[in-house]
């Protein structure tokens, strides 16, 4: 794969300054955007630049990229050696019934046709929202802890030991699951049972 860090003149590391990355992208994107650049390969270069930016701004894809660039773990073997950490399995066991409860509530709500049936669901709505809020708080704490680990990895990255590369791979796996779970439990995606005023 091409080194996305090199496209922005950055050293390959687990942590990068998001503001500096954004500025570097804006500067380079303006120079190679097809609308302002007549060169025949401008569109391809802009697409490549955008893909590199998307890779680097997300800590999960950035870590995956670093693991691949290190050459320590061949790309085709990454999926085989990446197992789900035990702590995530335990956490998922707690998330699963909450998501099931949310799904059940949404089904009941969509089937409710009258203001009375909606009103009868308000207690269940509050219960589901409370459970989601508690779990969301835990997941955000786990995400913050993962960000701290990202900084720790960055401090030792130049060592490039196999153990360090493996830690990066495991952290990417954990953060990917956290991203997915946090997105799936967003409270603002839960419709209210309060009927709309006539």
List where the protein language model places each region:
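C-terminal accessory/regulatory regions appended to core domains
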Residues: 1-198
């Amino acid at each position: 794969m091409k080194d996305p860090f090199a496209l922005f003149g950055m050293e390959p590391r687990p942590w990068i300054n998001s503001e500096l990355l954004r500025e570097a992208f804006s500067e380079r994107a303006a120079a190679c955007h097809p609308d302002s650049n007549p060169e025949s390969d401008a569109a391809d270069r802009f697409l490549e630049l955008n893909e590199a930016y998307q890779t680097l701004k997300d800590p999960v894809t950035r870590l995956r990229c670093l693991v691949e660039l290190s050459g320590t773990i061949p790309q085709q073997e990454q999926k085989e050696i990446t197992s789900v950490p035990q702590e995530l399995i335990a956490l998922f066991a707690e998330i699963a019934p909450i998501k099931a409860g949310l799904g059940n509530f949404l089904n009941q709500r969509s089937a409710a046709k009258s203001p009375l049936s909606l009103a009868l669901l308000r207690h269940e709505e509050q219960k589901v929202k409370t459970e989601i809020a508690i779990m969301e708080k835990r997941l955000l704490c786990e995400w913050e802890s993962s960000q701290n680990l990202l900084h720790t990895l960055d401090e030792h990255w130049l060592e490039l030991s196999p153990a360090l590369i493996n830690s990066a791979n495991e952290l990417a796996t954990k953060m990917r699951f956290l991203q997915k779970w946090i997105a799936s439990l967003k409270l603002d995606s839960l419709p209210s049972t309060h009927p709309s005023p006539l």
